[in-house]
């Protein structure tokens, strides 16, 4: 048995033996048939919806499991990885011994041995010079469908000489019975070995572990080569001008980068090298909770045959209730990027970025709707990765909840955050890019900044009119803010003007400034971080 050069002997090199059959890079048509097979049970089986997409259930894991993430600590990683047990910063890069890795690998390979396997060969990264050739091995048809959607699909010619740089073995059906004596978090695991170039998955069925696993690997490899690795969306204008949008969930990253006047490069993961900005992925992984055709026509229209829904409620007639979050608020859909019409073709890459937009949704009502950042301020706010959620009514919570996530993606960083900031600013200086902090949150009026005003701000950034505006300095945070912008309500540009008195703003600003200062202390164990303290707020 040999399929595209994959033989039982090749799989034996990974530790997988006695394979019954190999389904290699199956077509969407075959996957559609396989994942709905009446012989499948439990989480393996998908169901067809009225929209044409197949829906699956990922079990108790409806999101990533960061506490179960491990990296083998060896000569390759010992002095490069940002470890959870070293330094000031708390992170999810938990060290794993070679001995425990060997045991976990045996668990997964035993699970996959003797089975009918689906193998997907794909690329991570649209630039051939820095892309990873990744081989995914799974016994579950819909997991093969997920990675076919999310990663870059090679041509037949590219598959002929395909040599994997990295192997992902998904043994979702197996768990680790020895986790306690090994000092691990639970019986489930997502483990990486940078020397063997392998990712192992056990116990969790969540598809995003494969997507974000490879993002984490790119986040390790690329910055060490001087290439920026970014958790951002990106688009390009008619004149070839590229903008990247950083932001945590709920800040408007997807909404604001989706613009009828600009083509989408990608919605989530990008690199920036000597040639420009490029997508890591060949698909999109969009949230679907409360999705409607009216509010998000592009995403809604992408949910059709070949798309894969996760953890949504499917009614008896096959209709999807996107408003039902009873299983999870993190309902998702994956689909190939060409399901979105206004995209960069044929390859998801463009030139160098000239605008870098850091999005925040400040529920404290302190930050201005837009400010122009210096190079040091860019690094400071990039490392801070701030956003905040409105206070809930439960348990008497009366103040907003701040979130600080390094580089707007702390969960996926394998190196110290300052390394990502340094590489980003180096790329920005080389291209003459300017950064802006855009607040899509609230102000002193208690109302959220309108999408109309925010879009006006984004337009002013992209067309350059903000750089011609008269600027003033906002105290405490020392931010340069425009006094007026075309199409934007001038009364909101200085957040102090939205309060009954400047003293009210000052009190809140001092409080938020202290939160920034306290958070940023964890980066001061690196010289680059300590040097940036002066670019932050002052009390």
Curated annotation (Swiss-Prot):
Pathway: Carbohydrate biosynthesis; gluconeogenesis. ATP binds at residues 212, 231, 247-255, 296, 332, 448-449, 454. It comes from the Bacteria. Gene3D superfamilies: 3.90.228.20, Phosphoenolpyruvate Carboxykinase, domain 1, Phosphoenolpyruvate Carboxykinase, domain 2. Binds 1 Mn(2+) ion per subunit. Substrate binds at residues 64, 206, 212, 332. Its EC number is 4.1.1.49. The keyword ATP-binding applies. GO terms for biological process: gluconeogenesis. Keywords: ATP-binding, Cytoplasm, Decarboxylase, Gluconeogenesis, Lyase, Manganese, Metal-binding, Nucleotide-binding. Pfam families: PEPCK_ATP (PF01293). It catalyses: oxaloacetate + ATP = phosphoenolpyruvate + ADP + CO2. It is found in: Cytoplasm. It is an enzyme of class 4 (lyase). One of its GO terms (cellular component) is cytosol. Mn(2+) binds at residues 212, 231, 268. GO terms for molecular function: ATP binding; metal ion binding; phosphoenolpyruvate carboxykinase (ATP) activity. Its cofactor is Mn(2+). Monomer. NCBIfam families: pckA, PRK09344.1-1, PRK09344.1-2, PRK09344.1-3. Involved in the gluconeogenesis. Catalyzes the conversion of oxaloacetate (OAA) to phosphoenolpyruvate (PEP) through direct phosphoryl transfer between the nucleoside triphosphate and OAA. Belongs to the phosphoenolpyruvate carboxykinase (ATP) family. This is Phosphoenolpyruvate carboxykinase (ATP). It comes from Pectobacterium atrosepticum (strain SCRI 1043 / ATCC BAA-672).
């Amino acid at each position: 048995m040999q399929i595209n050069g994959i033989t039982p002997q090749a799989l034996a090199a990974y530790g997988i033996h006695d394979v019954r059959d190999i389904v290699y890079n199956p077509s969407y048509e075959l996957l559609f048939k396989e994942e709905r097979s009446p012989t499948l049970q439990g989480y393996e089986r998908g169901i067809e919806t009225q929209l044409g997409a197949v829906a699956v259930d990922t079990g108790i894991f409806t999101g990533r499991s960061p506490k179960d993430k491990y990296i083998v600590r060896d000569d390759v990683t010992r002095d490069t990885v940002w470890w959870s047990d070293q330094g000031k910063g708390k992170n999810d890069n938990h060290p794993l011994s070679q001995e425990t890795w060997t045991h976990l690998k045996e668990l997964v390979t035993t699970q996959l041995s003797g089975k009918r396997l689906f193998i997907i060969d794909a690329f991570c990264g649209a630039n051939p010079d820095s892309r990873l050739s990744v081989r995914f091995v799974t016994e579950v048809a819909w997991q093969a469908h997920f990675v076919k959607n999310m990663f870059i699909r090679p041509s037949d010619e590219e598959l002929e000489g395909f040599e994997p740089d990295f192997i992902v073995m998904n043994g979702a059906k197996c768990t680790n019975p020895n986790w306690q004596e090994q000092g691990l978090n639970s019986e489930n695991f997502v483990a990486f070995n940078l020397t063997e170039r392998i990712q192992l998955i056990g116990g969790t069925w969540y598809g995003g572990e494969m997507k974000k696993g490879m993002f984490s690997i790119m986040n390790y490899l690329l910055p060490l080569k001087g290439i920026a690795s970014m958790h951002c969306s990106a688009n390009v204008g008619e004149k070839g001008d590229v903008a990247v949008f950083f932001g945590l969930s709920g800040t408007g990253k997807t909404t604001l980068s989706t613009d009828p006047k600009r083509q989408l490069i990608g919605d989530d993961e990008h690199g920036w090298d000597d040639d420009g900005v490029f997508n890591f992925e060949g698909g999109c992984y969009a949230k679907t909770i409360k999705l409607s055709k009216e509010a998000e026509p592009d995403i809604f229209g992408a949910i059709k045959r070949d798309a894969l829904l996760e953890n949504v409620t499917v009614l008896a007639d096959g209709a999807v209730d996107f408003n039902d979050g009873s299983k999870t608020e993190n309902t998702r859909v994956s689909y190939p990027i060409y399901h979105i019409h206004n995209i960069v073709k044929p390859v998801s890459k463009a030139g160098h970025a000239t605008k870098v937009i850091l999005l925040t949704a400040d529920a404290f009502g302190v930050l201005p709707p837009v400010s122009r950042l210096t190079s040091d301020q860019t690094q400071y706010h990039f490392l801070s990765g701030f956003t905040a959620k409105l206070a809930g009514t439960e348990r008497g919570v009366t103040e907003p909840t701040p979130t600080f996530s390094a580089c707007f993606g702390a969960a996926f960083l394998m190196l110290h955050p300052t390394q990502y900031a340094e590489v980003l600013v180096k790329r920005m200086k080389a291209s003459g890019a300017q950064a802006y902090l855009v607040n899509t949150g609230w102000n002193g009026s208690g109302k959220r900044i309108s999408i109309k005003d925010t879009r006006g701000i984004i337009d002013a950034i992209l067309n350059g009119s903000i750089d011609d505006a008269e600027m003033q300095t906002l105290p405490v945070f020392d931010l340069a803010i425009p006094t007026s912008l075309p199409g934007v309500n001038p009364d909101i540009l200085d957040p102090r003007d939205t309060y009954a008195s400047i003293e009210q703003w000052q009190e809140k600003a001092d409080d938020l400034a202290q939160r920034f200062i306290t958070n940023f202390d964890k980066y001061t164990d690196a010289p680059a971080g300590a040097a940036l303290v002066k670019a932050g707020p002052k009390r």
